[in-house]
Amino acid sequence: MAFSGVAQAAAAKDNGAKADAASVPTAYEVSILYADRTWIWKDGAAYFGKNGRSLRAWTSREGAASVGQGKWIATRDGKMCMDLAWRSKAYTGQQNRTCYSHRIKGGNIEQRKDPDGEWYSFKRSPEDPADEYRKFEPGDTKAAQFEESSKLIDSKN
């Protein structure tokens, strides 16, 4: 994968730093992780568009589908933020921002949900079966499910 060397390159930037020190990936490095990929969740998925940084997501819990549409950004302080407005048959929500921070530590990428989530392994070098990043698929692999959920929500019945 093209990104596998980014963690190592970033670790090399801090040549004189302690082995335990963490560095922050650039906005470009963070964007490589997400652009044109689908993040598979237990009960849905989110697609991070490449051009214009569009974002769409869907969930289906206990027979109740929800879809979210908006944008995503990568920041220079190592964050990926999702600005999504969720809707279902029962509600139409306001746009909300959810951010995840990233850091590179020991050649591995860690992630946490902001503002105060626990750091966990996101992408290790070499890859590990427990990595969260293994839930990402190249391309828009769940577009059909998103469209199906949208039609269900928008139907009058």
Range-by-range predicted roles:
Residues A7-Q69, T75-N157:
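Lipid interaction determinants
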